[in-house]
């Protein structure tokens, strides 16, 4: 029913980005992945570098769950990384896309960044420290992770000094 309503509204208001995004989501969730992907690819051509289009399409691709979908989402989001790096939703979508694409190092980095941006600096620090032990981490990635650890550590130490603890961490 949502698809029919949105399709009717889109016919009445052609070019409305928000209706087109909603229709694409409804198509995907109704099992019409190919039709939804085609709609989103068209929206990307019409609105290159649009955060709403990229984030919505990435979410749909991530829900599809295939390696190819993850690679497509990762490739689509990567150009926006420099301008959207401080957005936890963006980082979560990029992390999931990287995970599906088989890029565990980038996925771990993005999940850690999402944790930090969501107010969980200690979780982010722990994730980054675990990532440093990953043998797949190359020299450049290690330098990136070390720099991020160095920038997050003072925040974590200050929170500990103030007695602020992350309630989600199991402290044994």
Task: State each model region's role.
Residues 14, 48, 84-85, 102, ...:
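Short coil turns that delineate tetratricopeptide repeat
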Residues 22, 56-57, 93-94, 110, ...:
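Canonical tetratricopeptide repeat
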Residues 27, 61-64, 98, 115, ...:
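Residue at a conserved register position within TPR or TPR-like alpha-solenoid repeats
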Residues 33-38, 65-70, 100-107, 137-141, ...:
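Alpha-helical linker/edge segments of TPR/alpha-solenoid repeat scaffolds
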Residues 9, 42-43, 79-80, 114, ...:
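Canonical positions in the second alpha-helix
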């Amino acid at each position: 029913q949502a698809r029919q309503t949105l399709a009717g509204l889109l016919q009445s208001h052609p070019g409305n980005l928000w209706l087109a995004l909603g229709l694409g989501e409804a198509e995907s969730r109704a099992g019409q992945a190919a039709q939804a992907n085609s709609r989103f690819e068209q929206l990307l051509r019409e609105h290159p570098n649009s955060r709403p289009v990229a984030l919505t399409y990435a979410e749909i691709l991530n829900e599809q769950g295939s390696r190819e979908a993850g690679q497509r989402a990762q490739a689509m989001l990567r150009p926006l990384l420099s301008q959207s790096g401080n957005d936890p939703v963006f980082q979560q979508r990029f992390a999931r896309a990287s995970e599906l694409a088989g890029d565990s190092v980038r996925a771990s980095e993005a999940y850690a960044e999402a944790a930090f941006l969501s107010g969980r600096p200690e979780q982010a620090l722990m994730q980054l420290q675990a990532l440093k032990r990953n043998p797949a981490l190359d020299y450049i990635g290690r330098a990136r992770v070390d720099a991020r650890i160095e920038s997050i550590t003072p925040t974590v130490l200050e929170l500990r000094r103030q007695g602020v603890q992350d309630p989600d961490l199991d402290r044994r």
